[in-house]
Design a protein with these regions (language model features):
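Metallocofactor- and cofactor-centric catalytic cores in central/energy metabolism, strongly enriched
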Residues: 1-124, 131-166, 174-188
Length: 188
């Protein structure tokens, strides 16, 4: 439970029972690809999440910014957090920035999160969001002050789910909670 005995990593999680990893053999279309239906994978993931919740598991999500580009993706991930299927979140500055941009301005990367249409001058929206958050001094203060009520980071704050935001060399901002030194963030 405290990871003193190690951390279990299931590296063959998408292989079907009895299916072998064939990464060392040459074959064409022997396994799964983007063109393959993933319905069973989602069912398996739901079953795994339910099991972990029922058995007091500790589910850590590692998300990238693409999870915040669509209103429905933000809603579903937010609901997973709210319903107790996330005990911690690991991400970068970009996920938090664009998710909070979605709650603040209704855009991510300047595109409407409902229809993906570009807003005029929308490419500045993430910078406006970063500046607003920095003016408040923290993500929770920004969420409260601006009345944000949706999204991934909002749900982490509302439900006291810890998150670690690790920086990269390309980050705009970054946000106040971002670990700018990658190794410090990794150690967190």
């Amino acid at each position: 439970e405290d990871a003193s005995e190690g951390i279990y990593v299931h590296d063959d999680c998408w292989l079907r029972e009895g299916e072998e990893d064939s990464k060392n053999t040459f074959a064409f279309r022997q396994s799964r690809s983007r063109e393959t239906s993933f319905t069973q994978d989602y069912k398996d993931l739901v079953e795994l999440l339910r099991y972990e919740k029922e058995h007091n598991g500790y589910v850590v999500w590692v998300l990238g910014p693409a999870c915040s580009f669509d209103v429905e993706a933000r809603r579903v991930m937010g609901e997973l957090i709210a319903q107790g299927y996330c005990q911690a979140l690991l991400a970068g500055n970009a996920l938090a920035t664009h998710d909070l941009e979605g709650g603040y301005l209704g855009t991510a990367l300047g595109c409407d999160i409902e229809n993906q249409k570009l807003h005029f001058m929308g490419h500045y929206n993430h910078l406006d969001t970063i500046n607003a958050i920095n003016t408040y001094g923290s993500i929770p203060a920004f969420i409260e002050g601006e009345g944000i009520h949706s999204g991934i980071i909002y749900n982490c704050v509302k439900h006291n789910v810890p998150f670690v935001l690790n920086g990269s060399i390309r980050d705009d901002g970054p946000l106040p909670e971002v670990y700018e030194h990658t190794y410090v963030g990794q150690d967190t």
